[in-house]
């Protein structure tokens, strides 16, 4: 399959897109950043924020999958994709750097904060060794890591 990935509203590395890329590459699929001049079997569009504009141009693909909190707070990656090591090669980042979450969720119920609605109460998610997988540095993307004994102990 020919797969396109599209980060609609984020300049930061998108962990979900990196995991989707890893999943498809492991299956032997061709994965690249979406190019409007190319035709794809499937394009994954990721949108982080609800208040940012959507990609309002034609997407040349047989199938389009939109995901991320900006589109649907209830949609999540399938577990077999979510637990994969991300494909860091799609971004120009340090080869010793990893991204991930030790915990998911949030203990607070702020009206404006989507995380408790999307992920529930704070809970352990991954071990640091799962995140780094031999890399020397990690950027932890947790929303409230110090609110968890698990996150605090790591």
Q: Residues of each region from the PLM?
A:
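Short loop/helix-cap segments at secondary-structure boundaries that form the rim of catalytic
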Residues: 36-40, 54-61, 71-79, 130-134
């Amino acid at each position: 399959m020919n797969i396109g990935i599209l980060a609609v509203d984020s300049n930061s590395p998108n962990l979900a897109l990196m995991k989707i890329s890893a999943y498809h590459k492991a299956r032997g699929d061709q994965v690249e950043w979406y190019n409007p001049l190319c035709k794809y079997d499937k394009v994954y569009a990721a949108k982080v924020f609800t208040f940012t504009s959507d990609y309002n141009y034609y997407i040349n693909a047989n199938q389009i999958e939109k995901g991320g909190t900006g589109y649907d707070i209830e949609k999540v990656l399938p577990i077999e994709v979510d637990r994969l090591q991300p494909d860091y090669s799609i971004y120009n980042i340090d080869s010793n750097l990893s991204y991930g979450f030790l915990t998911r969720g949030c203990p607070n119920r702020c009206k404006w904060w989507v995380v408790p609605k999307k992920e529930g109460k704070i809970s352990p998610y991954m071990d640091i060794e799962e995140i780094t997988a031999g890399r020397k540095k990690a950027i932890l993307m947790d929303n409230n890591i110090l609110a968890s004994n698990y996150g605090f102990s790591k």
